[in-house]
Amino acid sequence: MTVFWAGRAWLDGRVADDVRVRCDEAGRVAAVEAGVGPEDGDRRLPGVVYPGGVNAHSHAFHRLLRGRTHDGGGSFWTWRELMYREAARLTPESYQRIATAVYAEMVAAGWTSVAEFHYVHHQPDGTRYAEPHAMELALARAARAAGIRLTLLDTCYLSSGFGAPLTERQARFGDGSAEAWLERLAALRTRVAQEYPPGEVSVGAALHSVRAVPVQALDVAAAGIAAFGAAMPLHVHLSEQPAENEACLAETGFTPTELLAEHGLLGPRLSAVHATHLTRTDIELLGAASATIVMCPSTEADLGDGIGPAHALRAAGATIALGSDQHVLLDPLVEARMLEQGERLASGRRGRFSPAELVAAMTIGGAASTGLEVGEIRVGAFCDLIAIDPDSLRTAGSEDAQLVMSATSADVLEVVVGGVTRVANGVHAVLGPLSGVARTLASVAR
């Protein structure tokens, strides 16, 4: 059993003094006390301790494009062509190497859990690997090496657009039918449960988008997902681009949100990623369903997607979570800050999300999205902690409760996942100095 002591820590939406956190052998919080001094043998954490960030949307291999796509202008759709090129060259071995480095960067930045929206399932020509879960297991092994908690969202991807088959470059994403995808998903769940303990790696479901899952397949997918039980997370890219909305309306007469509602896919298990271009009816439907909305501010800014109606969605009853998506940066604090900054730009008003609400989006919102017992320093939750420096050049003078408005990942001093220190003083417990991780990232991007 490990006991941590922090001079200041985030408990129940505020900063408390002199906090002692006892973790059991399963890596969960067994006891929390505030207003107590350290005891002999306690591990003293530096700075101000917050719950670890929960990254609710990741495409690990997109990290290969960071800083390499900005000299030609374009849009989301031209960027996508570059992304397909990277997807085409992935193998299980290279994907594991890439994801290990990316997940290590996440942990060092303060993300302690990640939902990986994964659709590169098969060989480039669409045939299965001899090990049918080779790509998925590569991600699971990468998460274990990096020390991050993984929700592996196995994605259904069947068409390139409404009424259009997958292109040659998309062949490795598809299973041929919703039934075949569900069969493979069920087998993957069984395999992961056999090899990984609960909370380390878990399996969820994703529909890539309404344009990538034919209307006739939505009912099959909905029934199959429901059969897995209420705890199975379901994620979908939703209304990221106006062109998707226009095509959906032309093909079905519904917006993407309305189409999901028509097929029984709205509900508390659903995480709608981006949700950038919504009608008032869409917002009301998502709020009434108690859905989670995963905003990815750095990616949405990088790709010129737009600013989603996060404030209106929260007011309607939705939960807000955060994701790093294509990893233009990996920084939960900056991601949270950009959520508020986007709202300020769109509304002309400050304080649309308070610092406490931004911390909640970075932590509790992601817990709702992944179904994991994380995001809070409380009894029963996993003991995932990040220690933030309140005295750096960026944070000096900031109030402890407002560090989310000034700190960056460079101010993360120590990261604990499951009661074990994974990163401290620029060194990863398994992978060594973070400079080595950086060299790996540089080499795989070439």
Predicted segments, located by residue:
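N-terminal metal-binding scaffold of metallo-dependent hydrolase/deaminase domains
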Residues: 1-38, 48-49
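Histidine-centered catalytic micro-motifs
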Residues: 51-63, 233-240
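Alpha-helical scaffold segments that flank or form the walls of functional sites
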Residues: 67-149, 180-198, 439-446
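Histidine/acidic-residue-rich catalytic or RNA/ligand-binding cores of hydrolases
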Residues: 67-68, 242-254, 282-287, 304-313, ...
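Metal-coordinating catalytic core of metallo-dependent amide/deamination hydrolases
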Residues: 125-273
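Glycine-enriched alpha-helix->loop->beta-strand junction motifs that scaffold or abut catalytic
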Residues: 225-231, 265-268, 285-294, 315-320, ...
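His/Asp/Glu-enriched, well-ordered alpha-helical/loop segment
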Residues: 262-269, 311-391, 406
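C-terminal cap of metal-dependent C-N hydrolases
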Residues: 382-438
